[in-house]
Amino acid sequence: VQALDFFPTFMEIATRKKYKNKELDGESIMPLLKGKKMKERNLYFFRAYNTDQYAAIINGDWKLIKYHSGKYQLYNLRDDISETTDLQNVYPERFEKMKKDLRNWETNVVPEYENDYRKRINY
């Protein structure tokens, strides 16, 4: 569950109908509130401030992190919650699939920006 899921949830509560808007990234969490499971989906994260970590995708137990330097790391969060063992070479198909999903998301969602915060604030 992410904060962007609240609006579709509140709309579903208010209207008693599933709120459908393709421009929203969130999904109603009504199934969870009714004690059911939500369908699995990718969760995306983006950092625009000065850090090497740039973006990440979580799918089920799996997390792929992309760095500004071009490096990637793949973790199984169920088995390695501390993210100590990079598994991209152990699970190359999963790595490539998640990398492709992250690239598609970046293309469609992430705005162009200046990633050096010193330039953004005229430092």
Where are these regions (language model features)?
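Hydrophobic packing residues in well-ordered alpha-helices of helical domains and bundles
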Residues: 57, 95-98
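Intrinsically disordered, low-complexity polar regions and short flexible loop motifs
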Residues: 80
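Residues within well-ordered alpha-helical secondary structure of globular protein domains
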Residues: 12, 35, 90, 100-104
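Charge-dense polyanion-binding interfaces
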Residues: 97-115
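Active-site-proximal N-terminal segment of extracellular/periplasmic enzymes that hydrolyze or transfer
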Residues: 85-93
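A general alpha-helix detector
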Residues: 9, 83-86
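C-terminal cap/loop subdomain of S1 sulfatases and analogous C-terminal strand-loop tails that border
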Residues: 2-77, 108-112, 118, 123
